[in-house]
């Protein structure tokens, strides 16, 4: 989750799936971010860096784990990209990598989290991206990913 600094700004919760999260060191993590309908995480971390990751156990042993830190966006044009992209499978719809330096870790019981069984990843994003093609994806980013819903620029907007 991320949030802008203004008290009336919108808090962003962005659930993730796929094999997109990596632990880079004892206090650094990253996730590969795909093109989607907004770009709140990039805009918020560009403004203030604050980011929280939450993981929930949905099997027999309940637990919630939160990672608190300062994050930033890395684009394919950035010097960091080559090394950071190495552990990820990069897709045509990969938009950026969000990197966070973790300053605090917290766990809680998770007793209120229901049990669920994983049945598989969704293919719809990749089908959508393929139907758009490279040019269509670029146009989609231009229309939907330059600014947050509160009007904050994402890193993509800051380099255009």
Annotated model-derived regions:
Residues 1-160:
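Binding-site signature for planar aromatic cofactors or substrates
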């Amino acid at each position: 989750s991320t949030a802008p600094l203004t008290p009336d700004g919108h808090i962003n919760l962005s659930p993730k799936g796929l094999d997109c999260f990596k632990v880079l060191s004892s206090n650094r993590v990253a996730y590969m971010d795909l093109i989607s309908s907004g770009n709140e995480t990039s805009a918020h971390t560009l403004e203030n860096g604050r980011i929280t990751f939450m993981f929930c156990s949905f099997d027999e042993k309940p637990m919630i784990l939160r990672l608190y830190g300062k994050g930033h966006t890395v684009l394919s044009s950035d010097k960091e990209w080559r090394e950071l992209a190495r552990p990820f499978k990069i897709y045509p719809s990969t938009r950026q990598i969000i990197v966070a330096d973790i300053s605090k870790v917290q766990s809680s019981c998770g007793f209120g989290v229901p049990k669920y069984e994983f049945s598989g990843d969704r293919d719809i994003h990749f089908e959508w991206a393929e139907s758009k093609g490279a040019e269509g994806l670029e146009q989609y980013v231009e229309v939907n990913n330059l600014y947050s819903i509160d009007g904050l620029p994402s890193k993509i907007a800051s380099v255009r």
